[in-house]
UniProtKB/Swiss-Prot annotation:
Residues 55-131 form the EMI domain. Glycans are attached at residues 66, 443, 562, 616, 732. GO terms for cellular component: collagen-containing extracellular matrix; cytoplasm; extracellular region. Residues 467-491, 615-663, 726-761 form a coiled coil. The keyword ATP-binding does not apply. The keyword DNA-binding does not apply. It comes from Homo sapiens (Human). It is found in: Secreted, Extracellular space, Extracellular matrix. Its main location: secreted. PANTHER family: EMILIN ELASTIN MICROFIBRIL INTERFACE-LOCATED PROTEIN ELASTIN MICROFIBRIL INTERFACER, EMILIN-3. The lineage of its organism: Eukaryota, Metazoa, Chordata, Craniata, Vertebrata. This is EMILIN-3.
Length: 766
């Protein structure tokens, strides 16, 4: 009821002030026709209490301004996404749950309100017209207190500030506002009344006195009426024309009717003014508030399209991320298989290199063993070196004996002649005879001594060098004997003379034996000994050749082992199977056993060489030991052959396991093909999802077409809302169906991952 009364009051104000246009039309005082009732805007009733003269400088203007208010327009639903983290691990994607939530919807209502503004009448300036109320550029007078409005039924109260025409909203008036079609009808009625009143006011103003229209300060105080005041001041020429002829009685009667109608509206103006003053503070706050944009159907359509586009993008991004995750996982599995194959090939290459190194080491050890055997074949003639050492020892003993003789000669008690003879005879028999016997034995083994002494570290010197050394030492002995004889002759003349012939005879005997020794050291005397040595060397060579043949058989077996390893390496290179670490470990163990056996063989060979070097006392014992060692070597070679046969059987087993690995690789390939089929099914599902998204877009287009008819919401508010809620329910059902499809796709993806894991696990175990 309050709103209806407000509308009636606004209609009355509009009818009263309908002559005002957009910029405002002033209402000036004018003389009333004879016989008409007098009425003033500044007094209430028909008998004004105060003189209206001081108030005629102010005129009431009709101004239009916009009023905004916030209204609640039902509720709207929006989709809220809730993200939940997966509990299975960081690689598992989270789940998204979409919920429909209702929230209130508001709109901003606009209303153009017609109001009264008190301003200076055109052409009035001075102390009775304040500066802030002046319309034209007149001289600014000193400000005085505003004139008091006469009290009565219509109390204007504090005069509101002047308002200019409100600028139109950038969005325009969107559809019916707060009061709907009733307000539009009232505005149409007000506009028609304004046109009618403007026509009548023009007819009345054409008969008015120009002097009174100017409203100068010298004009007499007359009752205030209605009229249209032209822009600016009235010229003096118009004043001189005088009053015009009065119009017809019909015009005056119409003016009287309008005045009576205005009198009936005064009471309504009182109530409207009171309500306006009561709502002034609220209106001021609304005027100061910035206008907010209107929520139109275009904005709603744009919002719905943006949300659907974001939802579609998020769903497509989720599918793309899942497909990329599946593809990356398949790529990682393929890279892992490739890496395992490369590791197997690298392990086979390292095994081949280690076998080559072991083969070279075995060959070097066999060559060293052959050289040691060749050295042992000649070591039987090492007694010559011992005989040379014995000769050197005897020479040293001879020198010591001479030194003792010299010291005894230099002593205070010189021995007698018979003692000298005994000493010289003992020396010659004990030292020189032994030396000559050693030389004879040395001549018998000259050929062996030459071969042995060539390997001595002190230098290579033969029989000739040894003979020169002996001659030098014999000469030194002769010189020492000569000096000894001189000393003896100097000390005792008679004993020396008796002993000199004995010494000379001893020396002559010594020279004869040396000459016989030189004559006996000829090649003809050593031929028999050399023949025996050559026969012995040939026997040793035959034995070493037999040992070399055994070593050659060993090398052939090693070459066969290398060929088998090469075949295994070729099979490893051709196969595309997974890990071969267990088989390679077994092969390494076998090779380690072979290397250990070869190491034992080398140790036994070193022991044999030590035994050969230690068995220099007897050739028979050496021969027996060599035969025993050769027999042991043969036994080890036979045992090694059995081990090689076992290794061959293990290689055959490895071939069978390689075939099994190939079968496992074929199974993995079939699993990958099934994974590809699953990926194709996922792509088909994504295509079906695109079709569903297209259906959702079609539904959104239909929703937009339905939203285009929302302008008729005030008249038909139920059917569009029901259709909108039905489309919202359809959108919710579509989202629920999409959620189920996403869950189904996730389950299919997890099943595919589980199948791949089950297929890869047996290959890793093999």
């Amino acid at each position: 009821m309050g709103r209806r009364r407000l509308l009636v009051w606004l209609c009355a104000v509009a009818a009263l002030l309908s002559g005002a246009q957009a910029r405002g039309t002033p209402l000036l005082a004018r003389p009333a026709p004879p016989g008409a009732s007098r009425y003033s805007l500044y007094t209430t009733g028909w008998r004004p209490r105060l003189r209206p003269g001081p108030h005629k400088a102010l005129c009431a203007y009709v101004v239009h301004r916009n009023v905004t208010c916030i209204l609640q327009e039902g509720a709207e639903s929006y989709v809220k996404a809730e993200y939940r983290q997966c509990r299975w691990g960081p690689k598992c994607p989270g789940t998204v749950t979409y919920r429909t939530v209702l929230r209130p919807k508001y709109k901003v209502g606009y209303k153009t309100v017609t109001d009264l503004a008190w301003r200076c009448c055109p052409g009035f300036t001075g102390k009775r017209c304040p500066e802030h109320l002046t319309d034209h550029g007149a001289a600014s007078p000193q400000l005085e207190p505003e004139p008091q409005i006469p009290s009565g039924q219509l109390d204007p109260g504090p005069r509101p500030p002047s308002y200019s025409r409100a600028a139109p909203s950038p969005h325009g008036r969107k559809g019916p506002g707060l009061f709907g079609e009733r307000l539009e009808r009232l505005e149409g009625d007000v506009q028609r009344l304004a046109q009618t009143y403007g026509t009548l006011s023009g007819l009345v103003a054409s008969h008015e006195d120009p002097n009174r229209m100017t409203g100068g300060p010298r004009a007499p105080a007359v009752p205030v009426g209605f009229g249209v005041i032209p822009e600016g001041l009235v010229g003096p020429g118009d004043r001189a024309r005088g009053p015009l002829t009065p119009p017809l009685d019909e015009i005056l009667s119409k003016v009287t009717e309008v005045s009576n109608t205005l009198q009936t509206k005064v009471q309504l103006l009182d109530k409207v003014h009171g309500l306006a003053l009561g709502h002034e503070a609220h209106l001021q706050r609304l005027r100061e508030a910035p206008p907010s944009p209107l929520t139109s159907l275009a904005l709603l359509e744009e919002y719905v399209d943006r949300r659907l586009h974001r939802l579609w993008g998020s769903l497509l991004d989720g599918f793309e991320q899942k497909l990329q995750g599946v593809q990356s996982e398949c790529d990682l599995r393929v890279q892992e298989v490739r890496r395992q194959c490369e590791e197997g090939q690298a392990a086979s290459r390292r095994l081949h290199q280690s076998l080559d190194g072991r083969e070279l080491a075995l060959r070097q050890e066999l060559s060293q063993l052959g050289s040691q055997l060749q050295g042992l074949s000649v070591s039987g003639r090492g007694s010559c070196c011992g005989q040379l050492a014995l000769i050197n020892a005897r020479m040293d003993g001879l020198e010591r004996a001479l030194q003792a003789v010299t010291e005894t000669q230099r002593g205070p008690g010189a021995p007698a002649g018979d003692e000298l003879t005994r000493l010289s005879a003992a020396m010659l028999e004990g030292g020189v005879d032994g030396l000559l016997e050693g030389l004879e034995t040395l001549n018998g083994t000259e050929g062996g001594a030459r071969g042995c002494c060539l390997r001595l570290d002190m230098g290579g010197w033969g029989v000739g060098g040894f003979g020169t050394m002996l001659e030098e030492r014999v000469q030194s002995l002769e010189e020492r004997l000569a000096t000894l004889a001189g000393e003896l002759s100097h000390d005792s003349a008679s004993p020396g003379r008796s002993a000199r012939p004995l010494v000379q005879t001893e020396l002559a005997v010594l020279e004869q034996r040396l000459v016989s020794l030189e004559t006996s050291c000829t090649p003809s005397t050593t031929s028999a000994i050399l023949d025996s040595l050559v026969a012995e060397v040939k026997a040793w060579q035959s034995r070493s050749e037999a040992l070399l043949r055994q070593v050659a058989s060993h090398a052939a077996l090693l070459q066969q082992l290398n060929g088998t390893v090469a075949e295994v390496q070729g099979q490893l290179a051709e196969g595309t199977g997974s890990s071969l670490q267990g088989e390679i470990t077994l092969l390494k163990v076998n090779l380690n056993s072979v290397s250990k056996s070869l190491t034992g063989l080398s140790d036994s060979v070193s022991q044999y060489s030590d035994a050969f070097l230690a068995a220099n006392t007897s050739l028979d014992e050496r021969e027996r030991k060599v035969e025993a060692e050769v027999q042991a070597i043969q036994e080890q070679v036979s045992s090694q052959g059995s081990r090689l046969q076992a290794g061959h059987r293990q290689v055959l087993n490895l071939r069978g396991e390689l075939e099994q690995l190939k079968a496992g690789v074929a199974k993995v390939a079939s699993g990958l093909s099934r994974c590809q089929d699953t990926a194709q099914k996922l792509q088909h599902t994504v295509g079906h999802f695109d079709q569903r998204v297209a259906q959702v877009e079609g539904a959104c287009r239909r929703l937009g077409l339905l939203a285009a008819g929302l302008d008729s919401l005030p008249t038909e508010p139920l059917r569009p809302r029901e259709g909108l809620w039905s489309h919202v329910d359809q959108l919710n059902r579509t989202l629920a169906q999409h959620t189920q499809d996403i869950a189904r796709l996730r389950d299919d993806l997890l099943d595919c991952q589980a199948q791949l894991a089950e297929q890869v696990r047996p290959g890793q175990a093999n």
